[in-house]
Amino acid sequence: MERRSESPCLRDSPDRRSGSPDVKGPPPVKVARLEQNGSPMGARGRPNGAVAKAVGGLMIPVFCVVEQLDGSLEYDNREEHAEFVLVRKDVLFSQLVETALLALGYSHSSAAQAQGIIKLGRWNPLPLSYVTDAPDATVADMLQDVYHVVTLKIQLQSCSKLEDLPAEQWNHATVRNALKELLKEMNQSTLAKECPLSQSMISSIVNSTYYANVSATKCQEFGRWYKKYKKIKVERVERENLSDYCVLGQRPMHLPNMNQLASLGKTNEQSPHSQIHHSTPIRNQVPALQPIMSPGLLSPQLSPQLVRQQIAMAHLINQQIAVSRLLAHQHPQAINQQFLNHPPIPRAVKPEPTNSSVEVSPDIYQQVRDELKRASVSQAVFARVAFNRTQGLLSEILRKEEDPRTASQSLLVNLRAMQNFLNLPEVERDRIYQDERERSMNPNVSMVSSASSSPSSSRTPQAKTSTPTTDLPIKVDGANINITAAIYDEIQQEMKRAKVSQALFAKVAANKSQGWLCELLRWKENPSPENRTLWENLCTIRRFLNLPQHERDVIYEEESRHHHSERMQHVVQLPPEPVQVLHRQQSQPAKESSPPREEAPPPPPPTEDSCAKKPRSRTKISLEALGILQSFIHDVGLYPDQEAIHTLSAQLDLPKHTIIKFFQNQRYHVKHHGKLKEHLGSAVDVAEYKDEELLTESEENDSEEGSEEMYKVEAEEENADKSKAAPAEIDQR
């Protein structure tokens, strides 16, 4: 009661914070955590001006008042404690509550469920989510000038577990913490198959790289799925515990079936004395079943035929449990193995210990870098032979360098695989590198050999090849190349000048995917030789940009013609029915795998049939593309930025003005009809949209500031290019 009576002084009068009594300090168990995080323990005994001196550095003091919600109908709040917390200036403003609670010593689960309310002086308090909509706003951007009059009220929920939290209260932070907990039990690919989030979104949320927070609808959907998942998991554990009782040593013949339970319920009401009379000897015979069965559920003496049936059923249950456990522990690698775009590399089987028993060295990352330098192999080759993954994943692992002792399950599996590979003799590793190089140079041979070695595989092997031509620059030492942050602007200017897509430029300039280039231009990290992966990739792009302009244009034209001729060849050879299926399969091209140019046959001479086939309409959106666009609306919203439109255009192989018109039409239906336009199992042609079905400029201004200007510029640019676009340029976009 004493603490509650003093709490209004702290909540309503920021000028009296320095005079808060010592009773307001945090619990003793949290003091060490506070000192470790730099919380000014003596700041309460000094005037506010003393705290302001710390703002010159990298931290900002934030006064936090933590309140515990008991969940009752009266919503009676109990203040736990009030304390200053030093928060880094570069922390995202949306993560302020979570960062402050972690600094105060609270758990990740409590921090994820908390809600923040900010109070500025004597103004009315405002929820933290109402302050700004910018996902990249930092604490310094919002509190740099007003930190001395700001009070951050943090309300803790009474739910001790995430599954007890209502689905309506799930947010981006709770989803991230739940994903981190689930990734300790399974890898990302397995989790993506079960939960309503894609694998790329899971990775982005966990690594805090998702450029926009997940929508509230998606968070609530994930919360409902998480509650069901935990409930099913608890029921599964209970069934396994109950199945342990079904062994012959515990006399399973006395377990009644459902019909007997129903009849016992009736007889228990009619003749309770007779039921008690029969239950006494049975209790003495099966003491192990006493905790889980009440006397009213125990059966009378069973017939010999029923006893034999229940013994046979117990045998069957025990066999099923034994087989399932044996399969779960026999081939753990085979269950989690993913071949990506490659067939597995045949290796000699050696009696080596399994990955689970291999201790990962703390300097595994330096060992990998030393091995790359010693063997003079690329990250792509090492990632392929060491743990059968892509170069992008290896680059991320080496860039983050997470501690193996606290790594997630999926990362630990990859680290153990790399450690296993590095434990091989040096001669053996060099032989594997050579085999991989030969396989990359001769993809057809490797595909035939892998298909013959694994005839049971129903998946068609696809070899990821890097095209070693004279046009593509080869990776060499970039010590004598001067690279600055201006290279990102040069890349964008080059794509705009040559009118090429990100996918085409990434392919010819660095032999990378469109997604990789999109992330590169989005983050624009400062080039430094210390970041070896980024530096080598930028050196490769710099060498390409240093080529004369006419040579670069020739490379663009050859790559575009090669891609176009390959697609047209397959379209001509197929009968009319599977043509639409082919277009759906190629709407998401394999960005990192394309056949070598020198093996591509020349396009066949035009025939009457091929000339009769018209190129597909550039205003039509297929069913598969509709699904991707609707998923984007569900996850991000109806207002994609320029980067998102460019990404969708390259991914769906559609012009930008087609995608822009689709979003304008959807916003029109949401504004005037209150819901999205439904497409009943048919493709959409945006050319059929009427002018009145698109939002006008004034309506755009009311809904989203500045959106119509960007859409207008993009639409005019695409319409100007559309009239003179060649078939090759159409396909490359």
UniProtKB/Swiss-Prot annotation:
Domain CUTL stretches: 161-234
InterPro entries attached to this UniProt entry: CUT_dom, CUTL, HD, Homeodomain-like_sf, Lambda_DNA-bd_dom_sf, SATB1/SATB2, SATB_CUTL_sf, SATB_ULD_sf
Region (Disordered): 1-47, 435-473, 580-617, 694-733
Biased composition (Low complexity): 441-458, 580-593
Primary location recorded for the protein, binned into one broad class: nucleus
Sequence positions bearing Phosphothreonine: T467
Tissue specificity as recorded in UniProt: High expression in adult brain, moderate expression in fetal brain, and weak expression in adult liver, kidney, and spinal cord and in select brain regions, including amygdala, corpus callosum, caudate nucleus, and hippocampus.
Glycyl lysine isopeptide (Lys-Gly) (interchain with G-Cter in SUMO) crosslink residues: K233, K350
Positions with biased composition (Polar residues): 459-470
Domain (CMP) ranges: 57-158
Modified how: Sumoylated by PIAS1. Sumoylation promotes nuclear localization, but represses transcription factor activity.
Subcellular locations according to the entry: Nucleus matrix
Name of protein: DNA-binding protein SATB2
Species of provenance: Homo sapiens
Lineage: Eukaryota, Metazoa, Chordata, Craniata, Vertebrata
Gene name of this polypeptide: SATB2
